[in-house]
Regions:
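Charged, compositionally biased interaction regions
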Residues: 1-151
Protein backbone atom coordinates (compact mmCIF):
# COMPACT_ATOMS: atom_id res chain seq x y z
CA UNK A 1 0.00 0.00 0.00
CA UNK A 2 0.94 3.62 0.13
CA UNK A 3 2.64 3.26 3.52
CA UNK A 4 5.26 0.73 2.42
CA UNK A 5 8.80 1.91 1.75
CA UNK A 6 11.07 0.48 -0.92
CA UNK A 7 14.00 -1.50 0.40
CA UNK A 8 17.38 -0.15 -0.57
CA UNK A 9 20.91 -1.12 0.24
CA UNK A 10 23.01 1.36 2.17
CA UNK A 11 26.45 0.55 0.70
CA UNK A 12 27.27 4.05 -0.48
CA UNK A 13 31.06 3.68 -0.27
CA UNK A 14 31.70 4.90 -3.83
CA UNK A 15 29.10 7.64 -3.66
CA UNK A 16 29.64 11.14 -2.32
CA UNK A 17 28.01 12.10 0.94
CA UNK A 18 24.86 14.21 0.93
CA UNK A 19 26.83 16.84 2.87
CA UNK A 20 29.41 17.11 0.09
CA UNK A 21 26.70 17.45 -2.55
CA UNK A 22 24.92 20.14 -0.52
CA UNK A 23 28.21 22.02 -0.05
CA UNK A 24 28.88 22.14 -3.78
CA UNK A 25 25.29 22.89 -4.80
CA UNK A 26 23.77 25.51 -2.50
CA UNK A 27 20.31 25.18 -4.09
CA UNK A 28 20.01 21.62 -2.78
CA UNK A 29 17.87 21.60 0.37
CA UNK A 30 18.13 17.85 0.98
CA UNK A 31 19.43 14.81 -0.85
CA UNK A 32 19.59 11.07 -0.46
CA UNK A 33 21.66 8.46 -2.27
CA UNK A 34 19.92 5.17 -2.98
CA UNK A 35 21.92 2.07 -3.83
CA UNK A 36 19.44 -0.13 -5.61
CA UNK A 37 19.89 -3.86 -6.07
CA UNK A 38 20.56 -3.22 -9.75
CA UNK A 39 23.75 -1.45 -8.60
CA UNK A 40 22.59 1.82 -10.08
CA UNK A 41 23.11 4.62 -7.62
CA UNK A 42 20.25 7.09 -7.63
CA UNK A 43 20.38 10.54 -6.09
CA UNK A 44 17.14 12.14 -4.95
CA UNK A 45 17.46 15.90 -4.64
CA UNK A 46 15.03 18.36 -3.08
CA UNK A 47 15.90 21.49 -5.04
CA UNK A 48 15.10 25.05 -3.97
CA UNK A 49 13.99 26.11 -7.44
CA UNK A 50 13.62 29.86 -7.74
CA UNK A 51 14.19 30.45 -11.46
CA UNK A 52 13.18 28.97 -14.81
CA UNK A 53 15.41 26.13 -16.07
CA UNK A 54 17.11 25.81 -12.67
CA UNK A 55 16.33 22.07 -12.48
CA UNK A 56 17.92 21.46 -15.88
CA UNK A 57 20.93 23.63 -15.02
CA UNK A 58 21.46 21.80 -11.73
CA UNK A 59 21.29 18.41 -13.46
CA UNK A 60 23.74 19.45 -16.17
CA UNK A 61 26.20 20.85 -13.60
CA UNK A 62 25.87 17.74 -11.45
CA UNK A 63 26.43 15.34 -14.35
CA UNK A 64 29.46 17.37 -15.50
CA UNK A 65 31.06 17.35 -12.01
CA UNK A 66 33.71 14.62 -11.84
CA UNK A 67 33.46 14.24 -8.04
CA UNK A 68 29.94 12.87 -8.45
CA UNK A 69 30.52 10.39 -11.27
CA UNK A 70 29.52 7.41 -9.07
CA UNK A 71 25.93 8.65 -9.18
CA UNK A 72 24.34 7.26 -12.33
CA UNK A 73 20.85 8.70 -12.00
CA UNK A 74 19.89 12.04 -10.45
CA UNK A 75 16.27 13.01 -9.87
CA UNK A 76 15.53 16.67 -9.08
CA UNK A 77 12.33 17.24 -7.10
CA UNK A 78 10.79 20.36 -5.62
CA UNK A 79 12.29 21.60 -2.37
CA UNK A 80 9.26 20.81 -0.23
CA UNK A 81 9.22 17.11 -1.18
CA UNK A 82 10.19 14.79 1.69
CA UNK A 83 12.85 12.66 0.00
CA UNK A 84 12.74 10.19 2.88
CA UNK A 85 9.18 9.27 1.92
CA UNK A 86 9.64 7.05 -1.15
CA UNK A 87 5.88 6.87 -1.73
CA UNK A 88 5.67 10.67 -2.05
CA UNK A 89 8.81 10.76 -4.20
CA UNK A 90 7.36 8.22 -6.62
CA UNK A 91 4.00 10.02 -6.70
CA UNK A 92 5.77 13.30 -7.59
CA UNK A 93 8.00 11.53 -10.10
CA UNK A 94 5.23 9.88 -12.07
CA UNK A 95 2.81 12.81 -11.89
CA UNK A 96 5.28 15.55 -12.87
CA UNK A 97 7.28 13.68 -15.50
CA UNK A 98 7.23 14.48 -19.21
CA UNK A 99 9.90 12.26 -20.81
CA UNK A 100 10.25 14.51 -23.86
CA UNK A 101 10.99 17.49 -21.65
CA UNK A 102 12.53 16.19 -18.43
CA UNK A 103 15.19 13.57 -19.34
CA UNK A 104 18.85 14.58 -19.75
CA UNK A 105 21.53 12.09 -20.79
CA UNK A 106 25.26 12.62 -20.32
CA UNK A 107 27.96 9.96 -20.81
CA UNK A 108 25.75 7.01 -19.87
CA UNK A 109 24.17 8.83 -16.94
CA UNK A 110 20.64 10.14 -16.57
CA UNK A 111 19.21 13.28 -15.01
CA UNK A 112 15.48 13.71 -14.53
CA UNK A 113 13.92 17.08 -13.69
CA UNK A 114 10.48 16.67 -12.15
CA UNK A 115 10.38 20.11 -10.56
CA UNK A 116 7.45 22.43 -11.21
CA UNK A 117 7.83 24.13 -14.58
CA UNK A 118 7.44 27.86 -15.20
CA UNK A 119 5.86 29.42 -18.32
CA UNK A 120 9.39 30.48 -19.38
CA UNK A 121 10.22 26.77 -19.62
CA UNK A 122 7.49 26.24 -22.18
CA UNK A 123 4.86 25.02 -19.74
CA UNK A 124 1.71 26.96 -20.57
CA UNK A 125 -0.90 25.17 -18.44
CA UNK A 126 -1.53 25.91 -14.80
CA UNK A 127 0.53 23.64 -12.58
CA UNK A 128 -2.00 21.85 -10.37
CA UNK A 129 -2.20 22.69 -6.69
CA UNK A 130 -1.10 19.93 -4.37
CA UNK A 131 -3.66 18.26 -2.19
CA UNK A 132 -3.12 16.58 1.14
CA UNK A 133 -5.43 13.99 2.63
CA UNK A 134 -6.70 14.82 6.08
CA UNK A 135 -5.66 12.51 8.89
CA UNK A 136 -9.29 11.32 9.05
CA UNK A 137 -9.21 10.22 5.40
CA UNK A 138 -5.82 8.55 5.87
CA UNK A 139 -7.22 6.60 8.83
CA UNK A 140 -10.24 5.49 6.78
CA UNK A 141 -8.01 4.36 3.91
CA UNK A 142 -5.71 2.48 6.30
CA UNK A 143 -8.70 0.65 7.80
CA UNK A 144 -9.98 -0.45 4.38
CA UNK A 145 -6.66 -1.00 2.58
CA UNK A 146 -6.41 -4.76 3.18
CA UNK A 147 -10.03 -5.23 2.06
CA UNK A 148 -9.47 -3.25 -1.13
CA UNK A 149 -6.08 -4.69 -2.07
CA UNK A 150 -5.43 -8.31 -1.16
CA UNK A 151 -1.71 -9.05 -0.97
Amino acid sequence: GYKKEASTSTDNSRCPSPEKIMTVFEEVQACKVLQLQARRSVLLVALNKTAPHQGKQFIQSFLDHSAFSAIEIVIALEGHVDIENISTVMWKFFNNLDPKRDFYFEAGRLGIDVTQKFPEEGYQQNWPDEIEMTSEIKTQVDKRWSDLFKE
